[in-house]
Amino acid sequence: MIRPQLRTAGLGRCLLPGLLLLLVPVLWAGAEKLHTQPSCPAVCQPTRCPALPTCALGTTPVFDLCRCCRVCPAAEREVCGGAQGQPCAPGLQCLQPLRPGFPSTCGCPTLGGAVCGSDRRTYPSMCALRAENRAARRLGKVPAVPVQWGNCGDTGTRSAGPLRRNYNFIAAVVEKVAPSVVHVQLWGRLLHGSRLVPVYSGSGFIVSEDGLIITNAHVVRNQQWIEVVLQNGARYEAVVKDIDLKLDLAVIKIESNAELPVLMLGRSSDLRAGEFVVALGSPFSLQNTATAGIVSTKQRGGKELGMKDSDMDYVQIDATINYGNSGGPLVNLDGDVIGVNSLRVTDGISFAIPSDRVRQFLAEYHEHQMKGKAFSNKKYLGLQMLSLTVPLSEELKMHYPDFPDVSSGVYVCKVVEGTAAQSSGLRDHDVIVNINGKPITTTTDVVKALDSDSLSMAVLRGKDNLLLTVIPETIN
């Protein structure tokens, strides 16, 4: 009686491995089907797609794996990919199974950091927050809004990712240069007034530890109190030490017992067209505003711009020079000054005084100091101007439809506030064509006319012909 039972048990032991061997191919075939890529049509025909499905609350249809029809996405821990699987919901990733023979399922990406929600909870990842939000919407609860990367208790900033860390070279230059960039504020008294009011502002940068600052000549002028504000908020009174109206450069000086950050002059002759540059300054009285661009040409000759007596080549850039940015440094990616922001004509066309001329200007100033010579009094109008040429006139007509139909003269780029030019009625975009009965074709003609105590200017403004009288200021 016992022997048949033994035979049956033995038969079972023999049959079990065989059955398992038969089942494994079936399971493997099913898993293979799940991992096999879907068979996509050669041409997508949306008209043959099934009707747009109604998905679970909180999810919207997405394109299928063939990128043709819209289907409901797979939720967390649901099967994804393969011939039968679906694409995962936004924020989820189709994860490979831990063991062979099992399908891929949707889950949170392995990469990513903690995130703080508006419910003041710290979630392990953005994906985890979104998963809980989907569940909250299904239950009619309020979903959390991601408010910051990192834990909710963190007060510091998130560490830079690889792209920001490796390619954020502009920010590195600004951080290096900004402490040496200063805000130059001019104060003056209004007519019949005794109270000092701000009348003009510009920029500059420190070039020596004893407080020498380079800026534009049109930024500083006579009978004004000049205030310099450093990046750390320290304020100093400044005095003009030297000025060159032809170069549009000035040296001013502050007295400070603190150690001042200094910028080094690079060589503008080493610049290359297409090289990245950064223009820093304080437009609209804002500290350390930066604009970036490239060098359009490193030698835009003064004669090309219509300055017949000019032997200086300007650095043309496409970085924007805003109001108040004048006098700030133009730096390369090493943080060396390769120019002084000077002139903006139109969007994408700005000019800087090359650092090689700034170096020459400082050498001449040093020589004057060694010989005990003070610079002589000079006349000042308060204009940023450019000789008008045919190409420049055509460019200006494209930007300003009411620009006068003229191809020669001197174009007024900017009238400095509180100056003789502004008091006379001159405006931005005016064209000066005659002074004291003599035709004006270059900026040099305007500078030569400053020998007169009074200037009678013929000006074109749109379709109007104006006659203005300007009394130049004397810079002491």
Curated annotation (Swiss-Prot):
Active-site residues annotated for this sequence: 218 (charge relay system), 248 (charge relay system), 326 (charge relay system)
Region annotated Serine protease, chain positions: 202-362
PDZ domain sequence ranges: 383-474
Gene3D superfamilies (UniProt xref): 2.30.42.10, 2.40.10.120, 3.30.60.30, 4.10.40.20
Protein task: Serine protease.
Family assignment from sequence similarity: Belongs to the peptidase S1C family.
Residues covered by the IGFBP N-terminal domain: 36-109
EC annotation from Swiss-Prot or TrEMBL: 3.4.21.-
Residue ranges annotated for the Kazal-like domain, each copy included: 88-154
GO biological process: one example: positive regulation of apoptotic process
Keywords on record: Disulfide bond, Hydrolase, Protease, Secreted, Serine protease, Signal
One GO cellular component term: extracellular region
Domain of life of the organism encoding this protein: Eukaryota
Presence of the UniProt keyword Plastid in the record: no
UniProt-recorded name of the protein: Serine protease HTRA4
Keyword NAD: no
Signal peptide: 1-31
Compartments in which it is found: Secreted
Disulfide bonds: 40-66, 44-68, 49-69, 55-72, 80-94, 88-106, 108-127, 116-152
Main location: secreted
GO molecular function, one term: identical protein binding
